[in-house]
Amino acid sequence: MSFTTKVKEELIHLSTGDNNELAAIIKLSGSLGLAHQSLHLSITTENAKIARYIYSFIEDAYVIVPEIRYHQKTNLRKNRVYTVYVEQGVETILADLKLADSFFGLETGIEPQVLSDDNAGRSYLKGAFLTAGSIRDPESGKYQLEIYSVYLDHAQDLAQLMQKFMLDAKTIEHKSGAVTYLQKAEDIMDFLIIIGAMSCKEDFEAIKLLREARNDINRANNAETANIAKTISASMKTINNIIKIMDTIGLESLPIELQQVAQLRVKHPDYSIQQVADALEFPITKSGVNHRLRKINKIADDL
């Protein structure tokens, strides 16, 4: 599973969002058609779970029953494309979400109310990422988050919205549309917090810290850094086991005293056992830290 898919699947397991989230979803992946002298709305995605999420969202919000259709792409990837198809109440949905002008090309940016309200902004960013966003796998060491927009002014409004949350967002225009993007790891982690993907934020941070620790080892070229590298090497097995626990049963399933040691070990892979002991909220002995680390390793080995 790609990291992008992992984030999106975490988002759809959160409680259903508000109208601002749905507005972003429809604005970025919806299209209008005319059949039997009435409008119909199509919302497309390549993820079946997201299609079901959108289906339930519309069904619950407007008490109508959409339809899910799919077809196979004819390109080399041959992915399935899922379409949430709405025939009833389309005019009501467009009016309620203030999207009519957007579909007819009169207003392609983001509603001022969304740009001025933090909660509305968070919901809109969640919907925008869910339907048109991607994150480069942090394992690659090259950090990038992107959201694709058909219109440049929408991409620029997205950047403005992100900047409200102190993110260094930029835009770039392509022939087929425009992209709003983040390239700093800290900005991407903050974005994940803003949209509610807390588990993926922790995974991203753990991977980033692990990569940095490995890079520190590779750069060790004198006695001092060699000693740090030795400490980091000794902690790698435990850090990998902590990540394994995060990916399976979750760190929150551990007793609080093990959670505290695990969080410190991942955050500070260069710390000696004594430094970990001293950094705890209630400092303990080196043997106490070693005992807790052995417990963490055993839990991971048993998974």
Curated annotation (Swiss-Prot):
Keywords, ordered alphabetically: Cell cycle, Cell division, DNA-binding
Keyword Transferase annotated: no
MF-aspect GO terms: DNA binding
GO biological process, one term: cell division
Start-end of DNA-binding region: 272-303
Record-linked InterPro entries: Homing_endonucl, Sporu_reg_WhiA_N_dom, Sporulation_regulator_WhiA, Sporulation_regulator_WhiA_C, WhiA_LAGLIDADG_dom
PANTHER family found in the cross-reference section: CELL DIVISION PROTEIN WHIA-RELATED (PTHR37307:SF1)
Function: Involved in cell division and chromosome segregation.
UniProt similarity note: Belongs to the WhiA family.
HAMAP family named among the record's database cross-references: HTH_type_WhiA
Protein name: Probable cell division protein WhiA
Gene it is expressed from: whiA
